[in-house]
Amino acid sequence: VKLIHSYHKEAVFHRAFDITPNLEESIQTLISLHVDRVLTSGGEATAIKGQETIKYLQEHFGSHIEILAGCGINADNALEFKKYTHVKQLHSSCKSYKIDATTSNGKVSYGYYHDNEMKYEVVNCDQVSKLIHNTQ
């Protein structure tokens, strides 16, 4: 964290936080280390499932560390989620998939998915625009 801050950047802790045995103790540790932000789904598979915990973290620790809610957030649920939890930042992949035949030759594949070796993720600009529009 000191190294990151020495370059005038923010220290963000990723969702490894969500698998710690005690989220409250873990967030206090991150605060004591001067981490600026934590990406979390509230210790659940999605932020929607973890919204009670995220709301609690925001209410009790949000003035000391920024709570960045993510995993399962999209244009259709973002505004209600934001209003309920009072988080100021949301993380969303806004992804769709493209097919590129050049990613595989039958022996070697650079694709991400076993169901289709030629499929890869891209940011869907329409989803991003809708997310921004719906949360303004």
Predicted regions mapped to residue ranges:
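Alpha-helix-loop-beta-strand connector modules within alpha/beta enzyme cores
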Residues: V1-F13, Q51-N74, D115-Q136
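Catalytic beta/alpha-barrel core
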Residues: E10-P21, D36-A47, L68-G70
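Catalytic cores of alpha/beta
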Residues: D18-L33, L57-S63, I67, I73-S92
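Generic recognition of short, well-ordered alpha-helical segments
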Residues: E24-E25, K49-E52
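A polyampholytic, Gly/Pro-enriched intrinsically disordered region
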Residues: S32-R37, E117
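Glycine-rich phosphate-binding active-site loops on the catalytic face of alpha/beta enzymes
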Residues: V35-K49, T85-V108
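Active-site gating loops and adjacent loop-to-helix segments of metal-dependent hydrolytic enzymes
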Residues: G106-N116
